[in-house]
């Protein structure tokens, strides 16, 4: 990911805990690049928020569809705790339904990353609905 981002002059990259370390990604891409880092649980979040210069944290998963994953999701209360613990912009990821977006953004979460709920049913309508919700939070 980071090598590809560099080779195509992308604005940045996102790295997970199993990817290239953040500090190495920053050296490769430079200070002006946008670099986000994933946090899949509370301990990872604590580590990531201490990294100097992280542009955003991808907090996942918001919710879960399986019992196996239930113990690892953040939910609204977990996202609220994360938002209160850092000034780094947060992006909620994983298991987000359109009906969740407003509640998530009310917590001062900076954005949502969604796939499945957008692709169910009328894709265009779903995207427009989410866009409308997000637009209501943008600063004028």
Model-predicted regions and their roles:
Residues 27, 49-53, 105-108:
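Acidic (Asp/Glu)-rich catalytic clusters
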Residues 15-24, 58-70, 101-133:
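Glycine-rich phosphate-binding active-site loops on the catalytic face of alpha/beta enzymes
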Residues 1-4, 19, 42, 63, ...:
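Conserved beta-strand edge residues that scaffold enzyme active sites
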Residues 3-6, 23-26, 46, 80, ...:
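Alpha-helical segments flanking ligand/cofactor-binding loops in enzyme cores
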Residues 17-19, 24-41, 71-98, 130-140:
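Alpha-helix-loop-beta-strand connector modules within alpha/beta enzyme cores
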Residues 6-15, 35-84, 123-126:
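Glycine/Thr-rich beta-alpha phosphate-binding loop at enzyme active sites
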